[in-house]
Amino acid sequence: MTDGILGKAATMEIPIHGNGEAGQLPEDDGLEQDLQQVMVSGPNLNETSIVSGGYGGSGDGLIPTGSGRHPSHSTSPSGPGDEVARGIAGEKFDIVKKWGINTYKCTKQLLSERFGRGSRTVDLELELQIELLRETKRKYESVLQLGRALTAHLYSLLQTQHALGDAFADLSQKSPELQEEFGYNAETQKLLCKNGETLLGAVNFFVSSINTLVTKTMEDTLMTVKQYEAARLEYDAYRTDLEELSLGPRDAGTRGRLESAQATFQTHRDKYEKLRGDVAIKLKFLEENKIKVMHKQLLLFHNAVSAYFAGNQKQLEQTLQQFNIKLRPPGAEKPSWLEEQ
């Protein structure tokens, strides 16, 4: 009955056998992270209720907390408010029940995959792209960290050059016999300081752009990837459940459960395929955006650094103009907070 449905999937199911390959799986901390990811989607209940009896109990078994503090001796029939309270408690019980069943199935599926007793659906091409994105993000984070370190060093160098230029200028006024030597050294330090401020502005722009790419664009795509991975786990959990029911005996009771399981499986399959498509689209747009952004930023970084160490002040200023980077005029005071508004 399910062969037609399962055969249409664009992905493949990779069986995992307990023949010793389980030793190559990730460490236990990775398993704990996956289990936490399964458990984070628990229900959010605004009101607390106590459930008496088992799952098969009636709605009367739901007792709102606080109702037993002052027991009433009145035998008057229940009013509309009591019926509403029972209805709300029943809905919350259903939410908790569904969440518990879903969590149990997903945890069972996850453990089955990890210990080599189950199969998982894998889109090989998409999984490769996701792993490549995570590796790229780690490398870009390293570049971002180094860029911030370079910014800090440049700022410290500028402060030292500025102080050294002031010291040379002061000594030029107080040492007539060395006035010329102190004078041109002071001018050299001031020129280096000016070019350094221009370079610092370019590096700051470079770091800011990479930070946006890593913490905004890439992170947004990875959030969708996490949703996709959770949907994949749910899909496989309900697929396994449907397969087990299909292999069991067929009677009147089983037929109803099989139809219900098939409907639930189809819902999770649709969710999984939708998120798989979303991830593929976001990965494509992310790659295009990354190439566009980094082409501009790497050109800026190369031109600015080359011009600075070549002592080409004109080319350095032209580089900032080319990328529309504006700096405060040399010697200008920092504007007040009111002027910045």
From Swiss-Prot:
Residue(s) carrying Phosphoserine: S72
Annotated SUPFAM superfamilies: BAR/IMD domain-like (SSF103657)
Protein name listed in UniProt: Arfaptin-2
Top-rank taxon, per record: Eukaryota
Annotated function: Plays a role in constitutive metalloproteinase (MMP) secretion from the trans Golgi network. May have important functions during vesicle biogenesis at certain cargo subdomains, which could be predominantly utilized by secreted MMPs, such as MMP7 and MMP2. Also involved in autophagy by regulating the starvation-dependent trafficking of ATG9A vesicles which deliver the phosphatidylinositol 4-kinase beta (PI4KB) to the autophagosome initiation site. Involved in phagophore growth during mitophagy by regulating ATG9A trafficking to mitochondria.
InterPro entries: AH/BAR_dom_sf (IPR027267), AH_dom (IPR010504), Arfaptin_fam (IPR030798)
Keyword entries, A-Z: Autophagy, Golgi apparatus, Membrane, Phosphoprotein
Annotated GO biological process: actin cytoskeleton organization; intracellular protein transport; mitophagy; protein localization to phagophore assembly site; regulation of Arp2/3 complex-mediated actin nucleation
